[in-house]
Design a protein with these regions (language model features):
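Alpha-helical scaffolds flanking conserved acidic
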Residues: 49-55, 83-90
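Amphipathic alpha-helical segments within well-ordered protein domains
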Residues: 38, 56, 73-77
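Iron-sulfur (Fe-S) cluster-binding segments and ferredoxin-like electron-carrier domains
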Residues: 30-31, 71-86
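Juxtamembrane/interface motifs at transmembrane-helix termini
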Residues: 71-78, 104-112
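Short Fe-S-cluster ligation motifs
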Residues: 91-109
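Acidic, glycine/proline-rich low-complexity segments that act as flexible tails and inter-domain linkers
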Residues: 1-51, 105-131
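Short, thiol/selenol-centered motifs that function as redox-active sites or metal-ligating centers
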Residues: 55, 59-71
Length: 131
């Protein structure tokens, strides 16, 4: 059995089915990407599964991908996400995009922004030490 066939077998063992979209991409891409997808989407990594799905959902919302949004919503729910958490993720996804749009529209000086972020970080560190 070749690498592609072994990959399909592993996908079926992991997901219960080999989704059609996985069969539709080039074989070499699937054999390279599947181990990474399996590890970082479904396996153990530094970021807990529910939080990985929140990240994926926030990105999905910003790139306006219904496929990704559906998958990340389902997987977040499977990993214990509550309705309140999902609502917060939706807000944070829109909030980040909105502020990014405002900074770009203002053509705010990036070097100034960097300095201000560092100032805020230093202030937050000091405030945290006091508490």
């Amino acid at each position: 059995m070749g690498q592609y066939e072994n990959t399909l077998k592993d996908i079926k063992k992991t997901l219960g089915v080999v989704p059609g979209f996985m069969k539709a991409i080039p074989k070499d891409v699937l054999t390279q990407d599947w181990p990474l997808m399996k590890k970082y989407q479904g396996g153990e990594s530094e970021i807990p599964a529910k939080y990985r799905e929140f990240i994926g959902l926030a990105i999905s919302a910003n790139i306006k991908c219904p496929y990704c949004a559906l998958m990340h919503t389902a997987m977040a729910t499977l990993n214990g996400a509550t309705d309140k958490e999902m609502a917060e993720v939706a807000f944070l996804a829109s909030f980040t995009a909105r502020w990014s749009a405002m900074l770009h529209a203002l053509q705010y000086n990036y070097d100034t922004f960097v300095k201000e972020v560092h100032q805020i970080g230093e202030y937050a560190k000091k405030a945290k030490k006091k508490n």
